[in-house]
């Protein structure tokens, strides 16, 4: 799959195929520059490939966008500084010309869902980084997407906040039944948040390894103490090329 930037054509992805069942959770891992974020931008119809094709639920990215089938959350929360939290969360619905009463109801519901009730009138500068990312997820949830595309949404946060938000996101995914595709550099985050972890090789990116994470959808922080967690970490680190694979005794 190639795409063009100005006069330069770049082959970003080769033979990338990953099937995620409806309601499933999948992550993409791999070295910087391997095409993980490019794949997400192609799926969200931001970048148009000049060869190859991509699909979401059997629809082209353009069709999926027209049907509002997906929502994208990136590492930058992109909140308008002059709008309060509630107004920022309503923004996507406002662009869609959703009636005011309906967008207010859906925004308040999403704010409650991400644990920000009581902060509706706060400006972005009054919120922590973790709270701003939760607001970005709330804005995505107001669209009621079938597919939630996440491009390192917690990458700029400290480790403790990141892990707490991982488990909050698990709760939200369970409640909404959305299908999730996450781009991350964190092996532990991929294990916590995924049923399927796909490892991508260096550019041109291809899926070189797929691991099935057998923890079910009822997860908690205790999963870190499960011997399987360490085994998955070793498997994925080996697949990325970080170190030889070790097997638990």
Residue spans of the language-model regions?
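A short, flexible loop at the N-terminus of ABC-type nucleotide-binding domains that lies
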Residues: 2-15
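The feature captures the beta-strand-to-loop junction immediately N-terminal to the Walker
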Residues: 29-31
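Helix-to-loop junction immediately C-terminal to a conserved catalytic motif
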Residues: 44
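Conserved ABC transporter NBD signature motif
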Residues: 52-62
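Conserved ABC ATPase "signature" region
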Residues: 94, 101-119, 171
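Conserved signature/switch motifs of ABC ATPase nucleotide-binding domains
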Residues: 122-125, 143
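Hydrophobic anchor residue at the start of the ABC signature
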Residues: 137
